[in-house]
A protein has these predicted regions:
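PRPP-associated nucleotide enzymes
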Residues: 1-221
Length: 221
């Protein structure tokens, strides 16, 4: 996104974090914490990968995690949630479900919209979703590593005339190192070491890297 002199940046607000062991156990119970050699969607390599889809496939776990994340934003007035596909879809829906109804609610609850990648790989707002200029949006993601998808989503919203007032994720694996232009809160702080490919010790050992992220997924012809 375009940065301007004097822009204010935020890093993960740990004062809102709940003790994360209870939520981390949910991931471990579902077998969602994987160990091996992974190439992340950011291009970085890591020996640990959290596959949120494995825990979010269970509706009760998804509801619990979504409610926990939504609770971190109880001090904000939120009109709608927006997430990047695919990783943020389910958690965005569950966070929206747990949020209190907005003043404009017509009975359906807080809307959960999403952006998705077009043929060029850029995130876009499609499927008839529209953003009113005064709509207060919360960007929700599953995992932050570099924050790239979240920053891209914020840019899409701003270009469409919307206003992002905060962003959240189930897991912040960055160690709180990401600069966001809005307040940011994560349910679980789980710093995991990542490497650029040229410095990856697993590559030096000759271990092949697996690409587990949804950005690498392609539909069968």
């Amino acid at each position: 996104m375009m940065l301007q002199p004097g822009d204010r940046f935020f890093r993960t607000d740990r004062s809102h974090m709940q003790p994360h062991q209870e939520f981390l156990r949910v991931f471990e119970t579902a077998g969602a914490v994987r160990h091996g050699h992974f190439e992340l969607s950011s291009g970085l390599h890591s020996g640990t990968y959290v596959q949120c889809a494995l825990v979010l496939q269970y509706p009760r776990y998804a509801e619990k995690l979504g409610a926990g994340l939504a609770a971190l934003f109880s001090d904000m007035s939120i009109d709608a949630v927006i997430s990047p596909a695919l990783g943020g879809l389910i958690v965005g829906q569950e966070v929206a479900r747990a949020l209190p109804p907005a003043k404009s609610d017509t009975g359906g609850g807080t809307p959960a919209m999403f952006v998705e990648r077009d043929a060029s790989g850029a995130l876009t707002l499609r499927r008839g979703f529209s953003l009113a200029p005064d709509l207060r949006l919360l960007v929700i993601e599953d995992v932050w590593t570099t924050g790239g998808s979240t920053l891209e989503t914020i840019q899409v919203v701003e270009e469409a005339g919307g206003r992002v007032i905060g962003t959240g994720a189930l897991i912040d694996r960055s160690g709180g190192s990401i600069d966001f232009p809005v307040p940011c809160r994560a349910l679980i702080d789980l710093p995991i070491v990542s490497y650029i490919p040229e410095e990856c010790p697993l590559c030096r050992e000759g271990r092949p890297a697996v690409k587990p992220g949804s950005r690498f997924t392609r539909s069968a012809p």
